Amino acid sequence: MTSASDGVPARVANPVESSAECGPSNAFAVLHPQVQRWVWEQGWATLRDVQERAIPPILAADRDVVVSAATAAGKTEAAYLPLATRLLQETSTIMGFRVLSVSPLKALINDQYDRLQGLCERLDLPLHRRHGDVSASEKGRAIKEPGGVLLITPESLEALMVLRGSQVASLFQPLCGIVVDELHAFIGTERGMQLQSLLHRLELTIRRRVPRIGLSATLGEPGLAVRALRHDGRWPCQIVQADGGGQTVRLKLHGFIERDPFRQRGSSSEDEKPPHEENQDEIITALFQTLRGDSHLVFANARGTVEIIADKLRRRCEDQHLPNEFWPHHGNLSKAIREDVEAALKQRDTPATAICTSTLELGIDIGQMASVAQIGCPPSVAALRQRLGRSGRRGSPSVLRLYVQERALTPLVSVVDLLRMRFFQTVAMVNLMLRRWTEPPRPNRLHLSTLVQQLLSLLAQRGGIQPHEAWRVFCQTGPFHGLGNNHFKQLLRDLAKHDLITQDHDGTLVLAAMGERVVNHYTFYAAFQTPEEYRLISNGKTLGTLPVDFPLAPGQMLLFAGKRWQILEINEKGRAIILTPSQGGQPPLFSGNGAWIHDAVRQEMFALYGADDVPPYLDAGAQRLLVEGRDHFRRLDLGRVRLLQEGTEVLLFVWQGDRVLHTLRFWLVAEGIKANQEWTLLRLDKCKVPEVEALLSRFVAHGPPEPLTLARHVAIKKTEKHHPYLSEELLDLELAGNVFDPQSAWEALRKTQAS
């Protein structure tokens, strides 16, 4: 079935519109005269709303500030105009960096460097950048003559702490401001915890607090950004949210049903398209017809999908003798290829569309996009909100198109297909986004892998530290406050067993032989896991890299950089794969973990099934999916029933998030029942409904399960970078807090029993 014509996406309330805590002020008047002159030279008639609101509290320098606004709303200048004023007003002659700006991506740093260069040159303020692609000579000059503004990634700041530990205090002694760019990208992540720890250690080193400024996309819950900016909340923080200015959002969700996957069986024609390719053609046609002639971003959830879609759209252009307008963009493409795509997007006179993963989700400067498209269910509400923010700049509406495909209903489809769960989850996320809700970070995460990295880094920086002082730095006053003293001691013992740390005669913790090797390896500075990657080479040119965690062999086909390749040779020692152009191809199976779905999303799905209204942004195809899903939901009486018999399996419907489902699954596993999660339900193998009802009643009577008991039944526990150094006891502790939610799982069962 094809979608209805694209038409004009429906207008809905703006999900990013908000008001500021601090009212508008004559901020321009309080800027330094040289900064005012620079503003005049830019030809600005007025400061933008977010700049008016942010300048006074940043100039006050007596609090942290979170500046929240949509992409291209002027957040960078909102931070740097008052910071530049403060630097020009200073009388101190101490050498050192005065502003530290941390960004999650090298490309963002390069963008900011170009953007700030004119301002800094005009004001005679030094501007430095430090990341993996910056030359050693440029890095060296910054260390020899530190001053002004330093733009840096968390990994390069980590390297600076390790390699220049004795110089850190002098390099940052005059520091008067810390900027965290794209703050929302750090919330709840390993890198976010790493950054919190690094900034805490930096303030301990220079022995004073430094005002922090977080620049973030529009937030559903601003308090999340406050806690991400400074972990302890012991300093006041002002939230500055830009006025939405009446901006509208145009939104359309297109629904598709794939063609019968069995209709081509028995065909012997070599020219016949494989079923998985034919099934995507309707979405490809919709994209091609709608997006041609302008600049857009199309987000797909996997790099393999990106390659397939980019390849199909490129071939459509070739078939119609048109210049190509569609290019892939993902993290495993080479820097040169990614920069070529970004440059094409910036060209206003030439249409260009990037098919991308989350690589273009953050604020890399690519100019104004006419619209954003999402293929399939978005990974989270937060990601959808951020992706929406990439369109609708400079007063024009934000335009979002979503394309969701469900399977044709045959006698063999699962209940997930009958209920159209992919579609309903997408609608639930859109509705929550429109209500300005976003996922909070998972609570109770210990981040033990990151703690291992930070402890080793601190030992490299200082040369050694007493155990009680390390506990104070990281757990008592630092961001790892969820770890008790006894478990911290266990962590030290675990690291000592692996020869990572040892103690001097006076008890001082120092790096041991293996610890020295780990810290000195170039991969140490990243807190997250970095899989083994191979370079992809054709005719001597590097196309990009591929994380290889699946079998490969010469003669195998790949899709990469939007083109089809055949593997000629695999050089294991050199970590290289030699390719030649080919007519066939399958997408490489890039690795990557899916997002966890929050309780609120599943509860919104349940409410949608039971409702009668039709969201105004659904096209005819999407409305059909809505009707089909609701019809089957009511036929199965799932508004009341939670257990269904399907052959030898029992389906348990909970309508809760993944943490609750994981908890219930391993609670059942602990009782000897094989249980598997499938979207918002659990499949219990070789069971009958009456015996499951009895077991769940016993669970409710017993009370919430013990999370450490559940953790012992998890087979794969070493999922993060430094987990191999930790004992089973600490891994179980990490799992108990990270994966399970016993109280919510028990309450969900109790409500099920009561209904």
PLM regions with names:
Residues 22-27, 59-60, 70-73, 80-158, ...:
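Helicase motor core with emphasis on the C-terminal RecA-like subdomain
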Residues 258-261, 515-522, 585-588, 689-694:
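Short, charged/polar, Gly/Pro-enriched secondary-structure boundary elements
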Residues 21-68:
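Conserved pre-motif I regulatory segment
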Residues 502-521, 576-583, 681-682:
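Accessory beta->alpha helical hairpin/"wing" motif in late/C-terminal subdomains of nucleic-acid enzymes
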Residues 234, 496-497, 527-533, 552:
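A short, compositionally biased
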Residues 2-6, 11-16, 20-21:
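Interdomain "pre-motor" coupling segment immediately N-terminal to P-loop NTPase/helicase cores
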Residues 397, 415, 419-426, 432-444, ...:
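C-terminal effector modules of nucleic-acid-centric enzymes and ribosome-associated factors
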Residues 516-539, 591-594:
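Short, amphipathic alpha-helical interaction segments positioned at domain boundaries
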